[in-house]
């Protein structure tokens, strides 16, 4: 359930601003929509602490401090760590530059540029060139040019000359570097020594990661405090703030305001207010979806639906059908058991894993799929659990493979039709209560979707369908959508009718899209079959190894089924989540563009 929110305006004496902010943070129920930027010093410090945290992760070991350092003790450590990281960066850049320069000089051998500069100071302006054999011969024959032949560099004749050569000769001059190869190598070695020193310090500093995390949290809280402080407005000795609170917290706010002697006003959010935060109230069942929503980073809009219950139900079924193997479900169940025993209390994510594991085992048992092994059907108990027309090995039950595939595909289309029809019913219910005539358009969509289901069966499965009544229902649904799709409480009947007729072509395209939406649920069948085929392929590969090569067979099974599980989990994200977030949510008209309710309070965890 999405909790109702109230807009609250809070006014206090300007001299009480700090007390106001402190009390609001302690209260922890007011959400501020448009906040000003936090003080730059807090933002810069948090960014630096984040960089330190990332840098020290690679040095983190088992031994860590038992308690964070005090603020006073942390500051010298913070400065020393910042200096060390800056020094490490400089040394790495210097080492890279020295290595690259030394690499370029490798073919020139080890020489001292300093000695060449000393010769130049004594009047010997030496220039080094590379050229071809013909030019080298011409230079040697020129009485006006004095050259010294050097060893070839890069298979090209090389020479030294006193003073620059005339521009008439095609030669490439070698610029004398500031440092020789030997000096550069020594410089690189010095950098390595400095980096080892930095590494030793960072290894020791990694033990203080808890202190860094503690300071990150404090800095983040300070940044939020300064942001709210900067958001407040003041005039004539008064300071005021505007935010949102859950309606259920209104009485608690009023008591706190009376104790603090604040002036306040409370009202419902305006109809066009798009900054209202969304606070979803979960029950014991729907809270299982929190980890999924957190991973996806989606929040329903304040005026949208809370579909967490339906999302959980369909997501669980989609997960089971996509993974499709009871053996894999047993592995997930074992993982859930281990995590539960290890933590002694199952987190929400682990509870969700329990549910998904059991659902996968049930679906796999109904289809007779156990690690892709056909031999599992020789076990009477496992065989007795199978629904024959759902069986992935239909020959064991006297069912033709075409019949089995058509049954699964039909089940997928039924799921799609039920889910999309549910969305229409939810829209009808809400709009009917709001006296919004566009509920008739959703009734039209309901009729069209249910009729299009039979069209899908006719085209995909080849089921005999009387298309004339189906076409009539689709046309009737189309007309209802066109006539009433533009209606809304703030429009007259004529205005709504005009808007609906103007969108007739769009409705036509959306009707075709509705057909495609039902068709898209076939992905559950396709991905499940692909997963089974992959499992069978690896099983057959492993069967080819016997005797001493049985170890190779075990490796093939572990790697093959491991990859299949990973691909299945990715498919759940790509396909299972998509059907909920796009097809189902699209039919509901949800955009998932909500703003998560984030009240002003002192957090005990770092916000990402």
Model features per residue range: what roles?
Residues 1-6, 18-32, 251-608:
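Conserved, carboxylate-rich catalytic/transport cores that coordinate ions
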Residues 1-310, 339, 346-350:
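Long, charged N-terminal accessory/stalk domains
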């Amino acid at each position: 359930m999405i909790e109702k929110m109230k807009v609250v305006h809070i006014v206090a004496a300007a001299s009480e601003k700090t007390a106001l902010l402190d009390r609001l943070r302690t209260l922890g129920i007011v959400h501020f929509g448009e906040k000003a930027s936090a003080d730059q010093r807090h933002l810069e410090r948090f960014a630096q602490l984040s960089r330190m945290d990332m840098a020290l992760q690679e040095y983190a070991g088992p031994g860590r401090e038992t308690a964070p350092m005090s603020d006073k003790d942390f500051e010298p450590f913070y400065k020393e760590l910042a200096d060390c990281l800056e020094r490490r960066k400089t040394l790495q850049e210097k080492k890279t530059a020295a290595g690259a320069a030394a690499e370029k000089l490798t073919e020139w051998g080890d020489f001292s540029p300093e000695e060449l500069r000393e010769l130049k100071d004594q009047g010997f302006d030496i220039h080094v060139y590379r050229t071809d054999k013909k030019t080298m011969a011409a230079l040697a024959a020129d009485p006006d040019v004095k050259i010294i032949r050097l060893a070839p560099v890069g298979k090209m004749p090389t020479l030294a000359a006193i003073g620059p050569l005339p521009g008439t000769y095609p030669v490439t001059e070698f610029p004398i570097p500031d440092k020789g190869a030997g000096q550069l190598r020594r410089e690189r070695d010095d950098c390595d020594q400095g980096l080892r020193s930095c590494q030793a310090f960072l290894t020791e500093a990694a033990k203080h990661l808890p202190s860094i995390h503690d300071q990150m949290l404090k800095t983040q809280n300070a940044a939020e405090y300064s942001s709210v402080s900067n958001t407040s407005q003041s005039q004539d000795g008064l300071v005021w703030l505007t935010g949102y609170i859950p309606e259920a917290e209104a009485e608690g706010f009023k008591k706190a305001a009376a104790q603090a002697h604040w002036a306040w006003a409370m009202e419902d959010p305006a109809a066009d207010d798009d900054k209202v935060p969304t606070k979803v109230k979960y029950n014991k069942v729907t809270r299982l979806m929190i980890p999924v929503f957190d991973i996806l980073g989606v929040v329903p809009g304040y005026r949208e639906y809370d579909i967490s219950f339906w999302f959980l139900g369909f997501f669980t079924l989609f997960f089971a059908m996509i993974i499709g193997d009871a053996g894999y479900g047993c592995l997930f169940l074992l993982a859930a058991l281990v995590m539960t025993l290890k933590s002694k209390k199952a987190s929400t994510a682990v509870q969700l894993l329990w549910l998904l594991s059991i659902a996968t085992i049930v679906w796999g048992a109904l289809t007779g799929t156990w690690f892709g092994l056909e031999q599992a059907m020789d076990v009477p108990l496992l065989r007795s659990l199978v629904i024959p027309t759902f069986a992935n090995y239909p020959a064991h039950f006297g069912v033709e493979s075409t019949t089995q595939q058509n049954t699964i595909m039909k089940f997928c289309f039924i799921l799609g039709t039920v889910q999309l029809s549910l969305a229409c019913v939810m829209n009808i219910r809400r709009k009917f209560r709001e006296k919004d005539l566009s509920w008739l358009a959703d009734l039209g969509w309901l009729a069209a979707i249910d009729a299009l289901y039979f069209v899908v069966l006719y085209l995909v499965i080849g089921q005999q369908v009387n298309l004339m009544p189906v076409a009539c229902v689709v046309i009737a649904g189309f007309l209802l959508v066109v006539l009433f799709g533009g209606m809304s409480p703030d429009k007259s009947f004529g205005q709504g009718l005009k808007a609906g007729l103007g969108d007739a072509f769009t409705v036509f395209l959306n009707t075709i899209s509705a057909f495609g939406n039902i068709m898209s649920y076939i992905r559950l069948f396709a991905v499940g079959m692909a997963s089974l085929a992959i499992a069978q392929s690896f099983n057959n590969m492993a069967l080819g190894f016997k005797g001493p090569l049985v170890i190779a067979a075990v490796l093939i099974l572990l790697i093959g089924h491991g990859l299949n599980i990973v691909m299945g989990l990715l498919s759940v994200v790509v396909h299972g989540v998509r059907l909920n977030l796009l097809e189902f949510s699209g039919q509901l008209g949800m955009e998932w563009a909500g703003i998560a309710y984030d009240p002003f309070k002192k957090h005990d965890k770092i916000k990402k």
